[in-house]
Amino acid sequence: MTHWFHRNPLKATAPVSFNYYGMITGPPASKICNDLRSARTRLLELFTDLSCNPETMKNAADLYFSLLQGFINSVGDSTQESKLRYIQNFKWTDTLQGHVPSAQQDAVFELISMGFNVALWYTKYASRLAGKENITEDEAKEVHRSLKIAAGIFKHLKESHIPKLLTPAEKGRDLEARLIDAYIIQCQAEAQEVTIARAIELKHAPGLIAALAYDTASFYQKADHTLSSLEPAHSAKWRKYLHLKMCFYTAYAYCYHGQTLLASDKCGEAIRSLQEAEKLYAEAEALCKEYGETKGPGPTAKPSGHLFFRKLGSLVKNTLDKCQRENGFIYFQKIPTEAPQLELKANYGLVEPVPFEFPPMSAHWTPEALAAFDLTKRPKDDSVKPKPEEDVKPVKEPDIRPQKDTGCSVS
């Protein structure tokens, strides 16, 4: 289902030449710098290459990160800092902040920022794959796994590398806790959407589907709350998406909970549960329109136009009609004024991030290679840093045209 997921733009970066004239005193260092330059260029190109798959991305990312490790950790002792950590200035934009970049003279900042973009690529790959016509079961599994991988990368950056930065992230920037938490939670929620779609397709028990939907809605609510203290100019569009998904999956939870109640001969409560689903579905429809009219980063998803979205509206209406008929002929139960409390706990299908680690240092980093970088020969004017306020050219992302909606239930 194309354009079902909201995606913020990729981070853009200034070119890095890895040219250290005068400092390089031997072929091993020269080769490493050449390899770094080509590996970085290749990885940046793959972010917008529609033919790129997870295997290609992993290989390219591992190559670059393994080479970059020599600028972060000392050769032969990963607990010691490399003498090269602070020799290069890196500039990266942020997903919500337009073209004005952040800049730090720190290889750890480069590792985190490029890793962040790799995670974003996995989310965009998942969205693109989910938008294919006639998506297969294996492709649905790949969507699910890609979102879990992305969550794992974001989580690893947050826990293991962002704390190492000497300059803390500014408020509203990608490496700030609120934003990276929102990305982690959104990835988990979207992966669970795939689980829900699968459970519906296989006609699992309504109680399980209701619990999964409720848990997913809670994820979206948590992500929205995480962003609530950000500047609305930057976060309003993203938050509208999170809010509409929260309403949509809460409606799903009430709909399937109503089916569970009806099966237990609690027809009056079932009607009230489905009335709540009907109200929340209408709210989600209204939020879809508001989301489409809200300005902000990223292309606009169009969830209300999808059969998966519309199917819920039909399901709620038909199930509510059935319950009302049954109550009029068989049960004659009073309909509660308050909607039932959803105290649902899913025991299956819950999504956890796939654990992630950066690759070990490249074998090209030997004591001889490190010694071939002579910092005493660093040019005196090398301390002149690029101005961080200079704009960085945005990434030109490919336009993903919506394909025919077949009603495939992989959301």
From Swiss-Prot:
It is a lipid-anchor. One of its GO terms (cellular component) is nuclear envelope. Farnesylation is required for nuclear envelope localization. Monomer. Interacts with CHMP4B. Interacts with CHMP5: this interaction allows the recruitment of BROX to cellular membranes. Interacts with SYN2; this interaction promotes SYN2 ubiquitination and facilitates the relaxation of mechanical stress imposed by compressive actin fibers at the rupture site. Nuclear envelope-associated factor that is involved in the nuclear envelope ruptures during interphase (NERDI) repair, where it is locally recruited by CHMP5 and reduces cytoskeletal stress through its action on SYN2 to help reseal the ruptured membrane. Belongs to the BROX family. This is BRO1 domain-containing protein BROX. It comes from Mus musculus.
